[in-house]
Amino acid sequence: MKASGVGLVFVLAAAWSQTLAGEEDTSATAHLVSQIDVRDFGAETARIGDLNADGGPDLLFVQSVFGTRAITCLTATSIFGEILWQTGSPSLDNGRIYSDLPVQIYDWDKDGKNDVLYVRQATYVDPAYDGKSPRERAPKYEGEARMIVLDGQTGKEKGGFALPAPADDCFLFADLTGCGRREDLVVKDRYWNIWGVAHAGEVLWHWEGSVGHFPACADVDDDGKDEVFVGFALIDHDGKVVFDHDAKGAHQDAAYITRAPDNTWRLLFGNGGIHCLTPKGEELWSHPLGEAQHVLAGRFRADSPLQFPVVDRTPVPHGRDDNAWGILYLYDLDGKEIWQRQQDKGAWAIAIVPVNWTGGGAPMGILVYGHLQGRPAVIYDGNGEIAATLPMAYTPSRDEKDRKADYYGLVADVWGDSRDEVILFGSRGACIYANPRLLETETHYNETLYPGM
């Protein structure tokens, strides 16, 4: 993404202040470029995208009722925390989550500007909400769920359509109709049902089974339409089942589709292990693990084109307490373990995101957050070494309890320098880190009045 004018001003001002001080710490592994006062709209769910149509990225903070997952407030801000718009009522009590939330940023109507889409729940007739326990589905609903489309610049409602009542867990965009753009939807309930929905709101198909957390989609049969992978099953664009393995009461915690260097597809998912499948459902390799909660694919090392980072949150049975810990693994294309890194005690809920921290065509890094107790996020390189440490930066008004609240992470190139920045966000704070190391590009150090290199 191209940096906005305000972003450039901020960077130049920061660089100028460092020059005036005469001390720029070139050994630093990360530079704090934005510290956001989230006041009462902080959230453990956030999205990033250009909302005000100025060419630069913005943030969307999403609050919900913890137990019901009903979305209560959406707050759009600049990357420096300036509020662009807000819909709903913010509350310090509604920033926490236990699951994904059905909200995304996308140019839904193809007018060249982003919209915000979210699902408004149908009425759960029973069970009655007790005010604290998670409520994942109901035996009976009143009405239907509804996809709401908001104008990204103003937050005003501009459209919407009905969805099946239980379809309020999360959704993703896919090309199910062969239009050449991912403008159809895959929607689901928490664990049991999934629907394909056309852009106009028509339900194309419904599949009942172990759908897991968040599906993955790709055109693995090269017919111009996406297939939907839910871990134990692969569903074609028209709802026909390509394969469906017996989940035996389990569900996928993470799903990923990638193309190997030989142009064949790999379908990976995690649950009580990490599994690598072909598009026909044949298992190429697997490793039993306690709880493979996160699975990625990418080039994280220079010695081979594709590796798979995996998080095991439960390598030994535990009560999810301060004595529990997780393990980060890195596997090669054939499933051979390259390395593993056991986390500190208490860091069992870690999550991972691929991050282009170095840029310049270098291998990706692995952002690891969720160490709990206010501990910093870190970036691992492909050798299993920590390349950067990123503590959550809170505004001075936050007390010690706030500073130990959970927070999450996402990445995006907010400066337009070909490298990712890291955005950390939670119910009590948000901040953005950049890589301060010099990125050398030929056009930066060989400038000329007569371009033509």
Predicted regions and their residues:
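Bacterial N-terminal signal peptides
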Residues: G5-A15
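Beta-propeller-forming repeat regions
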Residues: Q18-M453
